[in-house]
Amino acid sequence: MNATDSNAMKNQRSWRIGIFGTFDVENYGDLLFPIIAELELSRRLGSVELTPFSYHAKSSDDWPYGVESLAELPRMASDLDAILIGGGFIVRFDKFIAPGYGPPATWIHHPTGYWLAPALVGAQHGVPVIWNAPGMHCNEIPDWSHPLLSLALDSSAHIAVRDEPSKTALRPFVEPQRVHVMPDTAFSIGRCLKSHAATDEAAAIRDALGLKAPYLVIQATQNLERLTDYLKKFRTELPNLSVLLLRLGPVLCDHESFIDSELQGTFCLSAWPSPMVLASLIGGSEAVAGHSYHLAITALSCGVPVFSSSDLSQGKFTALAKFDTVHPLPPEGCDDPQWLSQRMGRKEPSHVVVEANDMLENYWNHVATVVRAGKTDSTTATSAFLMSLPGILEHGQRQAGAGDPESADHLRDLKARLIGCEDSLGEAKAQLSEVTRRSLDLETQLLELHQSMSWKTTAPLRRAWRWLQGLSA
């Protein structure tokens, strides 16, 4: 079947697109990506059947949308028309993603099972793989992953990451010009909210709470004392300002108890709402505060200033440094009652946000073109990799067996020093044993002396002698 015939068949059904990430946890930013992808691709492709894949299956009855378990991917992969990897901070190899979070089966590697493995499966089936602006965050890429990462990137139809540090990290594994830096796809959330039903639901929540404008959104998390202390200190200067505490990442332990309970005028939600309702609540505020990356992005896309507790010079947060409405928290002990009010206030999104949306428009247009182009023949790349696999494994085994010569010499030196220390310890123990024996002998002799008749007989003489010494003194 040629590409024309294949596309003709697809025109008679929905486009089947899989998106991969951590969509099975209560984390605001992660849950946005499938929603945005479906909205953007439906505008361009018509009927789209977007299937989020994560470790654990979820039902739309009690989750924002249905999620398929990654355990089903081997069965479903051949029916997909495209694969989106991410976004979010998913290009990682450490094991701690969230408390208790892991794969549903031991044969799924953690954590590459939800990003690297799907890209490899896509390469196997010739399904176009699009890296949907995921990212890294100051993390390492282990040696064992290099061949697999190279194959996945080489076989991908489009590679977009969300910041320069991520691009720098991935460039050694593919032709550098193929890695593109794009804004996080959540920068389009302001546009996606227009005419969305979530705006009405957010308004109903505000009415039920009695929350009126203006209000400040504070992420219910740690390390925001500088802001809450400032608000308490100058509460009389901001009498009409309400504070809405939001859990952006319950899975990462966000909770209202982290925020000073003495802060007046605060409101909390009784239940965690859908991601789009959270976005609407954020977008309706006059400012937001917290460390969440997607709290900041959502606010910026709606023209809302941000007070961030994060270091904008590190990792993923570097992408926020170019926005002049991203501010640090108030300085320690700030005495300026106008410091906060001078920086608050929702306005039209900045020109940087407008440019980000223009880039995302072009990105989604390109993604739609890639999807329409259909599957590709990736057998050459996968066959070459399989032929190289024995050599890769053998080299890895040799590396593990041989080790670094300098390290081996160092280990031998440590062993020799350990033996010397053990000998010295043995000698010290022998000396201690001899001293202990002699001490016991002396104690026995002293006890026998005190119990002897001569000691008892001479006791009056010793007392008289001590009395005479006292007189002479």
Q: Can you say where each PLM-predicted feature lies in the sequence?
A:
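Short hydrophobic helices that act as membrane-entry/anchoring signals
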Residues: T444, Q451-A473
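Alpha-helical coiled-coil heptad-register detector
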Residues: E406-D409, D413, G420, E427, ...
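Active-site anion-handling motifs in enzyme catalytic cores
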Residues: N2-S424
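Short intrinsically disordered, low-complexity segments
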Residues: L432-E434, R462
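Bacterial/eukaryotic Sec-type N-terminal signal peptides
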Residues: M1-T4, R437, A473
